[in-house]
């Protein structure tokens, strides 16, 4: 039991200037709030799960978007501001954190009372998760 915090796509490829799908300077303004959410959940002993964009070079998503967040590259890593926090990391290949991942099983195992979801690109990956 307990609660779960899902942190979606707070990765270098979206959050650091100079990358193909950088979400812009305004996106960085959410970092302190995300950190506070993580700290609050960890203080209460809740689970924190980081869901991170991580693609293969031939991913179908690249038919719609420029190549980004390739598996094993810096772009697919959590931003430095979040790397010191404990939590499980789930790489994803599509908008939804549930597509071909074990997120559903993890949530079933935890059986949370409440799931809080946060992250960048709320109109795409956060919404689809």
Language model features with spans:
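Short Gly/Thr/Asp-enriched flexible loops that form oxyanion-binding sites at enzyme active sites
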Residues: 126-129
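Internal catalytic-core helix/loop-beta-alpha segment
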Residues: 72-73, 79-123
